Amino acid sequence: MCNKIGEVKNKLKEYTPDNLKEKLPLLDSLLELHRSVAATVDIERSQYLTDHLKKTENSGIPMSIRRAQAISNYLSERKVFFHDNNMLGGATTGKALGAPVYPEYIGLTIWPELRTISTRIDNPQILNKEDADILNYEVFPYWLDRSISEEVRKVDPDRQSLQEKMIIYTISKAATISHTTPCYELVLKKGILGILCEAVEKEAKHDDDDEKSDFYQSVRIAMQGVLNYSANISREASKRANSEVDEERKKNFQRIAEVCKRVPAHPARNYIEAVNALWICQVCVFAENSNMAINPGRLDQILYPYFIKDFESGELSIEDALNISGSLWFKIADNVNLVPQAAEKLFGGAGAVPAITLGGVNKDGKDAVNELTYVLLKVTELLPIRDPNVNARYHPTENTADYRNEVSRTILTNKAIPAFFNDIQNIQTLVDQGETEEHARDYAVIGCVELGSVGRDYSASSSVFIPMYTVLYMALHNGRTTVTGDKSLWKATGKPEDFDTFEKFWDAYAEQTRLTAENAISLNNTYGKNHQEFLPTPILSAMFHGPMDKGRDLINGGSIYNSSGVTHIAFPDVCDSICAIRDVCFTEDNTDMQMSLSELVKAVDNNFEGNKLLEAYLKNKAPKYGTNHPIAEEISKRLIELSYSVFNDQENYRGGNYRVAYWTMTNHAGYGSVTGALPSGRRANVPFSSGITPVSQIDTQLTTSLNSVANLNSMHIPGAYALNIKYSPADPTHENVIKFGELVEGYMKEGGQQVQFNIQDYKTLINAKTHPEKYPHLLVRVSGYSAYFDTLNEAMKDELITRSQYNLSSGEFVPLQLEGE
């Protein structure tokens, strides 16, 4: 294998971003097309789904069967489009870049915008009048009282009302069944026909058990839809081939027709069959569920047997492998989420965040890096696009420094991708959560940064979002919030003047954390039970270990592991705020600044007006997370332990537990832009820090900041975290690559779980905000995924600009100097 890796790496050196047009004209043309198309709303799925459910409304057919029929009918009847010269058949929607409508989730949120969504300033999504009328008169009225949020409202109106306040908690099940990694390897080995036959046999075997029989019947129906869809692709490609005059396009259509005639119906035999089968499965999962964070998984492991067989036989050249793999990258990027104007403030600029995982160790704990790993890293280098979200697992003792350096070189070249994940910490964390070591070693990254064993853990890792700043506000205001009136929301836990010791304040904060968790968990479980009743998932279930053995849908607990994720917003800001409270209000020997908690809260609530000296002290002298200050080290660890103790042992609706995480997408910027001041010295309406990243513009060495994060107990962050680091631009020279890789390895050996990078300076980002026309495709790392800078909301752009910047060579902090300073 080592000789083959060397051979492949040498061949890959021929390909660079600068010679893409010359060496790989197909990928260059696909990149240009991808960059030129506008996001367009696609209503086809919503029409088919709604029509079928209307027709079967009073049929007495179980919902598991009705929904399987509806999805199967859509897959069987949907139109087949070829928008470009991509080597793969199948597409998420009928548009070159489509935003599918999921009316059973939050699709109705665009109802007020049907006439304006095409022309809005922030990330317009094209919707023609005919389609808008169909949504307005035919689709949306049916779902007005049937969407999952409205079904939940019928059961728990009070907690659903709080959900809509946005700042108490957010339950993402209102929007999606997602954030998990199917085992597409099952399809590559068995074929859809194999799964269908298994369903038929088990349906007959369990004909005396209605629940199991219905489940297997739903799988059978859904699998037939997958077969029909791939057959339709084959037929349409054959028609196109017969009428095509361009010889290259004709050959491509003929190849697609041949491939899709065989897969995914039958087991894959070669690389292009395996890649196209996997992609069609992804499309079909999106047809059943929403297009958010459904992850292809460990592609260099799943596809490797097919790649190496073809490569060694001479049937597959490196150029072929790059073109096929690059075609998959563009297919994965063929869709975006449907986002209403109001949500642009929180989620603007995000893609569908399908994560691809490379490298790490295999199920035996040995080095899993192979020739295909390097091919896919090269594709990532050549194609700087938002999706897929590529991630590199790294095991400091099993993987080679050569692999580590190649990942580092890729990041320095494309300036954002991939992220690094620490196999030692992450595997042990999953084992600590009850997964077997073999299963834990086979983890893939989910969505932004979350972890889960491939096809074994239906992790629903974005289930709950907890805004920690709201919990802090309640602890400082006797249980009140800014949106629920003068009375305590859950419980009155004391006014600031009641806290004569720090521990009394801490107890109030801990109690508000527990009460928020209790209510968020209750609502999440209600959503989950409604998913079980109204939104069964036979396609996704068939591509997991567990459901076919148990005769139980994935959302009914069919998977081997059944966790839910709870991520936290504003951890660094809240940590700094609690440090400031302890320092200023409860540290007797602090001679620089002392005041009562009541006085501090009053100053904060007034946004520090008339308290400039206090504001300056809190910003510049109070203990800060990320500086190794003993108070900050203690408070950061106590916060981690508190959330873990509150959530980890709580049971979800599938019998699993809640895994704590710290990643924020763009929520930290959106929420921060509408939130009041904090005791940390942060003024009102300033973005929060991202993920678990220390607050920006703290003058400290990079290694100091990294060590503060690495010292946190990752066993108690089983949902993972996002750490964002910004380096001054540096060329991918041998010296810089080595330095980059060694810093990552040192951080991991100290216990760091994950880290991702932006290789940008303040000036470039400021210019990109001021002159967006000059930077139309500037790719940046947000908090767990990448985005095009120009598509982000203003708050998120500002947060990226002000993120602390470090010099790679020295590790020195580079302060932000604004004009006039």
Where in the sequence are the language-model features?
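Conserved catalytic cores of very large enzyme subunits
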Residues: C2-Y216, E248, N252-R255, V259-E821
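Extended, non-transmembrane alpha-helical coiled-coils
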Residues: N228, N232-R235, K239, R255
